[in-house]
């Protein structure tokens, strides 16, 4: 108990000394040990890194989860060390509503079929969004959060210790300065005509006491200077580690961009597929709508047949020879009559599975290699693909052209 009381009294004395030194520095009544310019630059760089990391972290969280209530809920789960429950994305919820609406309206109706197709695409978009959020949280948000909650807390702690060591050092310097001034005053030769012998003896005794005080202050200053230098070196090493933090965050940023690129590429591909599927449905829906109403009585048989026959897929053929008029003609593509152009062909790798819509198209399997080429006047979004004896149109977006 006696030891604890002494330690408490010592800590109180140190705290009071630091408070006095800090107050006098703020009032301009005490000298302050300045750090070197390189150290100050490291401190400013660390503070800037911390501030911008916090802003980037918060805004990325808003990007991934715009709902503030959901963010607060996830924050509480993390603080309680509990697993965050799986949350249905907006796309998946919309897909559920569309599917239920299609079942209510009738899945065989044009509107019901379209709702089912769009709902399925929305579900895939929602799943892609979920994967992107998960990937971004692990590869980008977690490293930023680890820096703020780990490395930065260590740096802040060591900086506070360095600040205390500096206050102790400046307080020792101030005490030494006062002791030397008092010693010099006590060591001054007294005027015997104005000083009585008794006061002269007291002055000599005080001079000896101040000499001891100066030696004690110098010893404390050396110890405090050593502790300050050691703590400054520790803090400097931590601050120089900010460069490694930047390298790590740069790598995480690349991973975040890659995840975001894959996410938007998936969404774009899903919407392209949906657009093509809806394009195939549109002719059927129009035909069904027209077939429900009888043709006019005055209509001729060929006209009636034209209104009921389904549309035949065609591709435009545009001549590319210089001097020939640029006229567009509609012709039906017959894969057996297609021949490679004289300019040659290219190899391509299939990126995704593709189901042929009709006999003019070629079904594809992911990662297989095919031969492709273009014909004059073809739609730039399509190529002619060959696999063995099979030929047909293939979409460019499903291919990776190889040199």
Swiss-Prot record:
Main localization of the protein?
Answer: cytoplasm
Q: Which domain of life is it from?
A: Eukaryota
**Cellular localization per UniProt:** Cytoplasm
Give me the ranges of the annotated region Membrane-binding amphipathic helix: 1-27
Q: Which PANTHER family match?
A: DREBRIN-LIKE PROTEIN-RELATED, SH3 DOMAIN-CONTAINING
Give the SH3 domain ranges. Answer: 343-403
One Pfam family this sequence matches: SH3_9
What GO biological process terms does the UniProt entry carry, in alphabetical order?
membrane organization
Segments forming domain BAR? 24-287
Presence of keyword Cytoplasm: yes
Q: Which residues form a coiled coil?
A: 210-233
Q: Where are the transmembrane segments?
A: none
Q: Which family does it belong to?
A: Belongs to the endophilin family.
Q: How does it assemble?
A: Homodimer, and heterodimer with SH3GLB1.
Is Metal-binding one of the keywords?
no
| One GO CC term on file | membrane
What this protein is called in its record is Endophilin-B2
Q: Which gene encodes it?
A: SH3GLB2
UniProt xrefs under InterPro entries:
AH/BAR_dom_sf, BAR_dom, Endophilin_SH3RF, SH3-like_dom_sf, SH3_domain
Q: Which UniProt keywords apply?
A: Coiled coil, Cytoplasm, SH3 domain
């Amino acid at each position: 108990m006696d030891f604890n009381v002494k330690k408490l009294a010592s800590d109180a004395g140190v705290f009071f000394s630091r408070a006095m030194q800090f107050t006098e520095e703020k009032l301009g009544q005490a000298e302050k040990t300045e750090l070197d310019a390189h150290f100050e630059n490291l401190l400013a760089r660390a503070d800037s890194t911390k501030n911008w990391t916090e802003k980037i972290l918060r805004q990325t969280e808003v990007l991934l989860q715009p709902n503030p209530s959901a963010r607060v809920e996830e924050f509480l789960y993390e603080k309680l060390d509990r697993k965050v429950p799986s949350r249905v994305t907006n796309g998946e919820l919309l897909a559920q509503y569309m599917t239920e609406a299609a079942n209510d309206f009738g899945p065989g109706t044009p509107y019901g079929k379209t709702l089912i197709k769009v709902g399925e695409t929305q579900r895939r978009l929602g799943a892609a969004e979920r994967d992107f959020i998960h990937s971004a949280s692990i590869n980008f948000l977690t490293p930023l959060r680890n820096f703020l909650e780990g490395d930065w807390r260590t740096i802040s702690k060591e900086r506070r210790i360095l600040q205390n060591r500096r206050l102790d050092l400046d307080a020792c310097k101030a005490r030494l300065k006062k002791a030397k001034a008092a010693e010099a005053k006590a060591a001054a030769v007294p005027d015997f005509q104005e000083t009585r012998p008794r006061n002269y003896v007291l002055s000599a005794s005080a001079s000896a006491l101040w000499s001891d005080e100066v030696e004690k202050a110098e010893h404390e200053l050396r110890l405090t200077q050593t502790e300050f230098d050691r703590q400054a070196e520790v803090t400097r090493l931590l601050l120089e580690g900010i460069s490694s933090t930047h390298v790590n965050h740069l790598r995480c940023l690349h991973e975040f961009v890659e995840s975001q690129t894959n996410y938007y590429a998936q969404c774009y591909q899903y919407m392209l597929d949906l657009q093509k599927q809806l394009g195939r449905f549109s002719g059927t829906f129009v035909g069904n709508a027209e077939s429900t109403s009888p043709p006019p009585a005055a209509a001729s048989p060929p006209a009636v047949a034209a209104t009921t026959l389904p549309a035949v897929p065609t591709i435009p053929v545009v001549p590319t020879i210089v001097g020939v008029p640029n006229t567009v003609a509609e012709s039906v593509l017959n894969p057996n009559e297609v021949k490679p152009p004289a300019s040659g062909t290219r190899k391509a790798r299939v990126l995704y599975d593709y189901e042929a819509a009709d006999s003019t198209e070629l079904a594809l399997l992911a990662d297989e290699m095919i031969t492709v080429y273009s014909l004059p006047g073809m739609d730039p979004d399509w190529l002619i693909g060959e696999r063995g004896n099979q030929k047909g149109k293939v979409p460019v977006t499903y291919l990776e052209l190889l040199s």
